[in-house]
């Protein structure tokens, strides 16, 4: 026979004595279970020590998520707080964060979407749709991507022929766009808009269309 395990309630956990000496533990807040010798607690950070894939499934968490691998193709990660990814975001993945998003490597794929209420920091972006309530800061380059930021969009000069450049795609930076090179002979048109949000631009296009119509009719 085993011996009783002595465990106490840690942070955000309430313990209640039940019948036959059984103790029940209840979480007092949303979060992830953290178990250490002799204690059980609930914390507001979910740590994934691997890639997000079939072993983990999609993630939806009320708090912060730290992923020590990459987010696999087609999987979804949602958090009310920040999301930190040590690796990359593969094609077709979706990420939604109520805070900031930091991606150690890059984002790739036309069906890939990243949305953050705060800022987004990423090594590079190729063909993905990234939208931020703050800045979008890219360490190397952006190619054929959609970038919408209420803050600044910045691409740093690093190493490699693509470094510091925005080539192709649609880029909106409400507070400005900072880069070394815009456009490329190898890509389609590069659309850059600074100082205006997309909805404002649509209204301006409609207004211009009305003015032109009035001039000719």
Locate the predicted segments by residue.
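Charge-rich, low-hydrophobicity low-complexity segments
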Residues: 1-150, 155, 165-170, 174, ...
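Short beta-alpha junctions and helix-cap segments that line functional grooves
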Residues: 157-159
């Amino acid at each position: 026979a085993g011996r009783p395990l002595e465990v106490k309630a840690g942070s955000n956990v309430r313990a209640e004595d039940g019948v036959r000496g059984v103790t029940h533990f209840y979480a007092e807040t949303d979060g992830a279970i953290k178990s250490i010798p002799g204690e059980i607690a609930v914390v507001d950070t979910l740590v994934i020590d691997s890639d997000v894939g079939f072993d983990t499934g999609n993630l939806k968490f009320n708090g912060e998520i730290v992923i020590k691998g990459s987010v696999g193709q087609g999987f979804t990660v949602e958090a009310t707080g920040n999301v930190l990814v040590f690796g990359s975001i593969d094609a077709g993945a979706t990420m939604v964060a109520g805070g900031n998003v930091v991606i150690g490597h890059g984002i790739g794929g036309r069906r890939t979407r990243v949305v953050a209420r705060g800022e987004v920091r990423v090594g590079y972006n190729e063909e993905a749709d990234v939208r931020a309530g703050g800045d979008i800061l890219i360490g190397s380059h952006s190619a054929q991507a959609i970038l919408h930021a209420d803050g600044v969009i910045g691409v740093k000069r690093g190493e490699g022929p693509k470094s510091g450049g925005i080539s192709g795609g649609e880029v909106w930076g409400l507070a400005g766009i900072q880069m070394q090179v815009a456009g490329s002979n190898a890509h389609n048109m590069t659309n850059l808009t600074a100082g205006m949000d997309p909805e404002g631009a649509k209204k301006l296009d409609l207004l211009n269309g009305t003015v032109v119509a009035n001039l000719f009719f």
